[in-house]
């Protein structure tokens, strides 16, 4: 592990710290510089003094304002090591507005295509809606980094080119900090693309004519230029989009589009003009003339001149606080500083392990932190529990905020990068955003235990090694030294200190009742209650649970150990009927009312777990239906009619084997890592109550709990047999379920816990019927 080496001298660091004293006063650690960096205190003081000293007004009124704006244009070009001979500077509201300007005005000709990188900011995806291209394609990063379609070392020249294709990508991914090699720019401009990417739309439908176009590059540099030098003499993209608040912290509301001379040639005549962009426009005729100067044609209306003037102090502040040296420029030094911090954080995170050796975090990057030319000052990760389950990024945001740490969570307006780094296929994205209902910017962080986003920390020139040590200490103390319930209690106790959105997230930290499964007929399939459904409880458990059973000709209970096809009988509880279904076309109904059935039924006795059980025979018709579908003679359907108590503590039981309820934790099931769908594995365990704590096998430590205010006592773990080897949807056996549990539990066959409802303490003659509802909060006591 490489030790951290500071880029700045002690004197330089002291000067920087003095400019950001508000962080210490507010006890804040700021780690979201990819969102925006922070302004220096003397920077805004100097900007205000400049406004107080000068009369700065509309540039059409005052020449001084125009001179200031021209100074800023010159300074921007100098900052990127270029001149007005090579690039125009168009002021925009931000990088997004710059991208929109390119999309609206780029001339694709008759055959040009729009290509964009998957790992791009949402604003680049928005360009798809405005470009007038022949086709729209999504490129993988490697299809850009691989360079152009070079043939035999010569430029691929084709006569008669009819179109202009635009390739848009980020110089630095704002999700991971990965930097696409900038030498790809010239290669693509000269040789085109070796592969067009995935076609999303074409004016020709599925058919694509293989035409040869000129290629232009639009570089989204917003994330990159905040902490890295961009040399436009060395790399010459046709369009560069950026926001200045990313670089200076202040002012906001001003960005720029830099357009090369080559890029200007394919900017078409605009469909709109605003004030300041024309020489004249007649009201009585469709006649107008645009300005001669290129940038003036695209700067509609009055510029945000006060913000633009404020940029001068931004440039001066960087040069003052991070002076260039004989070896490195200001931005090169900032790049070295943030990269050094990111490398240190990544090294430290890799060392963090749970007591069982499992890593605390999962990191998301492509090439590691070996070369600042390929990786910037961003670290993206998710936290894992000791069992390997993911901790939701919303919880991390809460814990960090309560420790005074500001960081970013989610997908960071870059769903494509989220998809790539989290390994989400197209169906998974549909599941997260369309079916589960996640939206950009929310704290809906886990879907079926899998993360929908990540935690991101990013650094600026004012970030210190002490800042990152506080981050690391927060992770150690909160996720290596405490249990999940301790964290939840800590967050709940401090919740009033959180911002509104995170307060809402606190309500989601406690596990909830996800699903209830009623098994009306012992050993047959489940009747499931999903959110927001509710279900009544009786003295014996969930109403109608294991109230019927199938017996053979000897009166012995039939189970899946003898007849796996029982799982194919699907009970459906209706208003007054229990309908039994087998396959798509065979079904039979019996009455739900015990009184209705008792009048016509013969009494009989069977056994469950060696205990006698009184029951009512449900008749010959259903018996024949069962025998025909299961292929066994002499079957009967019995319904429990008498009270049955457990031998241990006289709790009232239905036809269950051991306790009123069996509780299962989906996180524990997820730890098995079977290839089959998770829901199918959950079904194997035939539990009544399904929760998800986010931490595997946490339930084995419970002594008591409440669900929606209903109290339960834990009877102990469920000792498993080979019944769980049966796939409850097909009836097929597979032994790996049992062997995996044995391995995870070190030879013990425990999975799920038995629980019993504690009767409510009431003196009412007719106590109120209790219901459980999917979504009820689970509180462990």
UniProtKB/Swiss-Prot annotation:
**Record flagged with keyword Phosphoprotein:** yes
Give the PROSITE patterns listed for this entry: MOSC
InterPro entries reported in the protein's UniProt record: Aminotrans_V_dom (IPR000192), MoCF_Sase_C (IPR005302), MoCo_sulfurase (IPR028886), MOCOS_middle (IPR005303), PyrdxlP-dep_Trfase (IPR015424), PyrdxlP-dep_Trfase_major (IPR015421), PyrdxlP-dep_Trfase_small (IPR015422), Pyrv_Knase-like_insert_dom_sf (IPR011037)
Its Gene Ontology molecular function terms?
A: lyase activity; molybdenum cofactor sulfurtransferase activity; molybdenum ion binding; pyridoxal phosphate binding
MOSC domain boundaries:
619-781
Name the residues annotated as catalytic in the UniProt entry.
Answer: 413
The prosthetic group or cofactor this protein requires is: pyridoxal 5'-phosphate
Tell me which domain of life the UniProt entry assigns to the organism this sequence originates from: Eukaryota
Residues modified to Phosphoserine: 734
The EC number(s) attached to this protein equal 2.8.1.9
Copy the pathway line from the protein's UniProt record.
Cofactor biosynthesis; molybdopterin biosynthesis
Give the record's GO biological process terms: Mo-molybdopterin cofactor biosynthetic process; molybdopterin cofactor metabolic process
Q: What reaction(s) does this enzyme catalyze?
A: Mo-molybdopterin + L-cysteine + AH2 = thio-Mo-molybdopterin + L-alanine + A + H2O
- Carrying N6-(pyridoxal phosphate)lysine, the residues are 246
Name of this protein:
Molybdenum cofactor sulfurase
Q: Which organism is it from?
A: Drosophila erecta
């Amino acid at each position: 592990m490489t030790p951290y080496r500071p880029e700045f001298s002690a004197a330089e660091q002291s000067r920087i710290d003095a400019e950001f004293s508000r962080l210490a006063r507010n006890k804040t650690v700021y780690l979201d510089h990819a969102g925006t960096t922070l302004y220096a205190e003397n920077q805004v003081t100097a900007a205000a003094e400049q406004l107080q000293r000068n009369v700065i007004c509309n540039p059409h009124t005052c020449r001084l304002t125009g001179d200031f704006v021209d100074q800023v244009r010159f300074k921007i070009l100098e900052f990127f090591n270029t001149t007005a001979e090579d690039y125009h500077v168009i002021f925009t509201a931000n990088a997004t507005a710059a991208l929109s300007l390119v999309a609206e005005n780029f001339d694709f000709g008759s055959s040009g295509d729009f290509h964009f990188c998957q790992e791009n900011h949402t604003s680049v995806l928005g360009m798809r809606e405005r470009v007038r291209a022949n086709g729209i394609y999504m490129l993988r990063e490697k299809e850009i980094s691989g360079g152009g379609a070079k043939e035999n070392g010569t430029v691929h020249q084709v006569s008669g080119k009819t179109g202009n294709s635009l390739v848009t990508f980020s110089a630095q991914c704002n999700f991971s900090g990965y930097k696409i090699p900038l030498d790809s720019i010239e290669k693509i401009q000269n040789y085109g693309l070796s592969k067009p990417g995935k076609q999303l739309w074409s004016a020709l439908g599925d058919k694509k004519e293989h035409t040869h176009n000129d290629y232009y590059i639009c570089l989204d540099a917003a994330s990159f230029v905040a902490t890295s030098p961009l040399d436009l003499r060395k790399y010459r993209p046709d369009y560069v989009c950026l926001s200045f608040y990313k670089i200076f912290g202040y002012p906001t509301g001003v960005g720029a589009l830099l357009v090369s001379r080559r890029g200007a040639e394919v900017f078409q005549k605009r469909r709109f003009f605003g004030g300041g962009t024309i020489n004249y426009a007649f009201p009585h005729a469709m006649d107008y003339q645009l300005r001669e100067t290129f940038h003036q044609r695209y700067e509609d209306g009055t510029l945000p001149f006060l913000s633009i003037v404020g940029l001068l102090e931004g440039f001066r502040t960087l040069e003052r606080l991070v002076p260039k040296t004989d070896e490195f420029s200001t931005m090169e030094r900032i790049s070295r500083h943030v990269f050094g911090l990111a490398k240190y954080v990544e090294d430290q995170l890799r060392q963090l392990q749970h007591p069982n050796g499992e890593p605390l975090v999962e990191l998301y990057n492509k090439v590691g932190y070996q070369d600042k030319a390929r990786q910037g000052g961003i670290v993206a990760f998710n936290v894992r529990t000791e069992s390997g389950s993911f901790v939701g990024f919303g919880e991390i945001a809460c814990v960090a905020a309560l420790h005074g740490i500001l960081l970013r969570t989610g997908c960071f307006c870059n769903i494509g990068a989220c998809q790539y780094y989290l390994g989400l296929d197209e169906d998974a994205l549909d599941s997260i955003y369309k079916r589960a209902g996640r939206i950009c910017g929310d704290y809906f962080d886990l879907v079926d235990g899998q993360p929908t986003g990540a935690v991101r920390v990013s650094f600026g020139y004012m970030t210190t090694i002490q800042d990152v040590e506080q981050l690391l200490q927060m992770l150690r103390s909160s996720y290596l030294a405490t249990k999940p319930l301790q964290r939840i209690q800590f967050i709940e106790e401090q919740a009033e200190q959180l911002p509104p959105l995170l307060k809402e997230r606190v309500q989601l930290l406690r596990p909830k009742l996800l699903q209830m499964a009623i098994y009306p007929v012992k050993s047959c399939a489940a009747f499931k209650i999903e959110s927001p459904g509710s279900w009544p409880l009786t003295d014996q458990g969930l109403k109608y649970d294991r109230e019927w059973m199938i017996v053979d000709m000897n009166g012995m209970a039939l189970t899946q150990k003898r007849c796996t096809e029982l799982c194919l009988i699907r009970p459906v509880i209706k208003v007054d009927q229990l309908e039994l279904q087998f396959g798509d076309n065979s079904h039979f109904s019996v009455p739900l009312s015990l009184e209705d059935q008792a009048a016509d039924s013969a009494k009989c006795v069977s056994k469950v777990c060696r205990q006698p059980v009184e029951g009512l025979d449900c008749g010959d018709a259903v018996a024949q239906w069962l025998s025909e579908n299961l292929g066994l003679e002499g079957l009967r359907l019995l319904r429990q009619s008498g009270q049955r108590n457990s031998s241990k503590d006289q709790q009232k039981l239905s036809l269950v084997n051991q306790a009123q309820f069996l509780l299962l934790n989906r996180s524990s099931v997820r730890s098995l890592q079977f290839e089959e769908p998770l829901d199918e594995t959950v079904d194997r365990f035939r539990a009544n109550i399904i929760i998800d704590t986010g931490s595997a096998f946490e339930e084995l430590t419970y002594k008591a709990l409440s669900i929606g205010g209903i109290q339960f006592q834990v009877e102990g773990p469920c000792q498993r047999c080979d019944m769980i080897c049966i796939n409850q949807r097909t009836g097929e056996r597979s032994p790996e379920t049992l062997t995996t549990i044995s391995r995870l539990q070190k030879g013990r066959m425990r999975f799920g816990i038995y629980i019993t409802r504690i009767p409510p303490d009431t003196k009412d003659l007719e106590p109120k019927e209790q219901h459980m509802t999917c979504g009820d909060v689970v509180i462990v006591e």
